[in-house]
């Protein structure tokens, strides 16, 4: 019986470096995620995990190194003011393949939930409005807030806002979902409803990179766990190995709290 074919690489980071002022936040990060991988990215505050995630869609531009999405490497150029993307249109195209969910929801407060979800598909991707509305309504039902379609974000709980943000990201039909601490701004009783949606996305086979403090999610849902410490990947592997037989003393201390 032949082995299953290896899944294509969805995201590849090679020797990524990033400095803010005199502080080197990423010190040569290399990481690979294949299609269908769920990668949980762990680390203490200031370890570089959110910066690494934000470099994937160029919200932060790395000083050096390569970011490759679905086989296409983002071209960078050195300028007197630092490193910049060489082709903004390339960045826009690659961003359209990446759904981003932020810690602070980042919904547009002057738009209803439905308007938030259809904004990018209609006005950025140029898809027919009626088609986008139908898809948005299905996504809102999918994340359990179909009854909130005409509400404004201020009238939603934090958990409902984050589920709306997930629907908004999915509406762009991304190849990869990026989550930057999606539950850390939520009241404890609201965390579960967001994690349930994320778990169901993983079960669909979606490619996900998740910066998180939720150890249960990392242990039970991920197929790869990455631990960053001071801008370096200290530990990486499947959760059953990382959580039970870690080679990193720092990671064991991190787990012990």
Name these PLM-found stretches.
Residues 8-239:
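ABC family nucleotide-binding domain
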Residues 227-230, 234, 240-257:
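C-terminal boundary and immediately downstream tail of ABC-type ATPase nucleotide-binding domains
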């Amino acid at each position: 019986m032949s082995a299953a074919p290896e899944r294509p690489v969805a995201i590849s980071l090679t020797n990524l470096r990033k400095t803010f002022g005199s502080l080197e936040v990423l010190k040569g990060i290399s990481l690979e995620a294949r299609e269908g991988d769920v990668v949980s990215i762990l680390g203490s505050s200031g370890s570089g995990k959110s910066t690494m995630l934000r470099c994937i869609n160029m919200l932060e531009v790395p000083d050096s190194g390569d970011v490759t999405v679905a086989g296409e490497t983002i071209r960078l150029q050195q300028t007197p003011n630092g490193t910049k993307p060489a082709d903004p249109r390339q960045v826009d195209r690659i961003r359209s393949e990446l759904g981003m969910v932020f810690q602070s929801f980042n919904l547009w407060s002057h738009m209803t939930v439905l308007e938030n979800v259809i904004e990018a598909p209609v006005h950025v991707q140029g898809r027919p409005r009626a088609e986008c509305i139908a898809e948005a309504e299905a996504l809102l039902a999918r994340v359990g807030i179909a009854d909130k379609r005409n509400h404004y974000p201020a009238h939603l709980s934090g958990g409902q806002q984050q589920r709306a943000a997930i629907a908004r990201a999915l509406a762009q039909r991304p190849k990869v979902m990026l989550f930057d601490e999606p539950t850390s701004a939520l009241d404890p009783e609201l965390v579960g409803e967001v994690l349930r949606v994320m778990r169901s996305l993983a079960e669909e086979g979606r490619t996900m990179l998740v910066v998180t403090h939720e150890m249960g999610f990392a242990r039970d849902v991920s197929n790869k766990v990455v631990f960053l410490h001071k801008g370096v990947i200290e530990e990486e592997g499947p959760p059953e190995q990382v959580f039970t037989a870690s080679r990193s003393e720092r990671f064991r201390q991190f787990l012990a709290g």
